[in-house]
Amino acid sequence: MATLGVNIDHVATIRQARRTVEPDPVAAALLAELGGADGITVHLREDRRHIQERDVRLLRQTVRTHLNLEMAATPEMVAIALDIRPDYVTLVPERREEVTTEGGLDVVSQQEPLTQVVQTLQGAGIPVSLFIDADPTQLAAAAKTTAQFIELHTGRYAEAKGEVAQQRELAILADGVQQAKALGLRVNAGHGLTYSNVGAIARLEGIEELNIGHTIISRAVLVGMVQAVRDMKALISP
């Protein structure tokens, strides 16, 4: 069964809405771990719309599970990662006008620069994951970068309307997991997963960790972070 990485970005979204000091993502991470989170994920965006560099530095000191830093493959972010040294980095595409990450990296068209970033980070002892769609050409390109992990983008599955469409997307993800494993890649997954749709993804053999954020933070507003994480853990690791 997959483990659970809790993305706490939207705790910071609430804080930044008022440009104040609360709620503190660092405190939220502690509560998530108390609830059973196996890891903490944050996305330090170039526009700093939610998570701030201060948050990542404090999380590096306080997280007791593992810290996954999502970031764009830019020189600024590489320098920050090399300085802070998260447990691993997930490279994601980023556009300033998007509300949230809209799809996977195009590794095929960015093979050379992504490979350089992967090798720089992994050469410094920081494992790298590439956030990609479950597309055979992208999977093959990801393997060529020497990244240790991929994170399969589950957004199309999450957004699929109707049972037939959802099962089709689930089959694509299942095939992607198997191809990735055959290429020697370790597999995580995430994006758009909720309490109502996570079960089928959690049952896919070969996925190591599910990274889930918005739905957990949404429930935490009502029942508290510890209980919200416990509820998700019960669904993915029954």
UniProtKB/Swiss-Prot annotation:
GO terms for molecular function: pyridoxine 5'-phosphate synthase activity. It is found in: Cytoplasm. Pathway: Cofactor biosynthesis; pyridoxine 5'-phosphate biosynthesis; pyridoxine 5'-phosphate from D-erythrose 4-phosphate: step 5/5. It comes from the Bacteria. 1-deoxy-D-xylulose 5-phosphate binds at D9, H10, R45, H50, T100. Coiled coil: none annotated. One of its GO terms (biological process) is pyridoxine biosynthetic process. The active site is at H43 (proton acceptor), E70 (proton acceptor), H191 (proton donor). Catalyzes the complicated ring closure reaction between the two acyclic compounds 1-deoxy-D-xylulose-5-phosphate (DXP) and 3-amino-2-oxopropyl phosphate (1-amino-acetone-3-phosphate or AAP) to form pyridoxine 5'-phosphate (PNP) and inorganic phosphate. HAMAP family: PdxJ. Belongs to the PNP synthase family. This is Pyridoxine 5'-phosphate synthase. It comes from Thermosynechococcus vestitus (strain NIES-2133 / IAM M-273 / BP-1). The gene is pdxJ.
